[in-house]
Amino acid sequence: MAAPAVRASPLAAFQALAKRCLEHGHPQLCEQALIEAEALQRQASARSAYPCQTLLLGVQADLVMQQLQAGRGALAISDLQAATRGCSGL
């Protein structure tokens, strides 16, 4: 019998993708991270998890700034870490 496949949670997958975007600025990575952030923040809204939603909106702003070559470096990574902690139940 085969072992069940282990999949990362949507939040963990988003965190990894967003971190790569913020560190390297590849347009395709950032675009996909924005799409995933939007889905997560809508999910947070639907669950009335407004603090989490607010944190995700901040990360979305950081991702857009990165796309515009105006990234905030370590501050953006810190925002991403805060969102990951604040949205842990998502």
Feature locations, PLM:
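C-terminal segment of classical bacterial N-terminal signal peptides
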Residues: 1-5
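Post-signal/leader-peptide non-cytosolic segments of secretory proteins
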Residues: 6-90
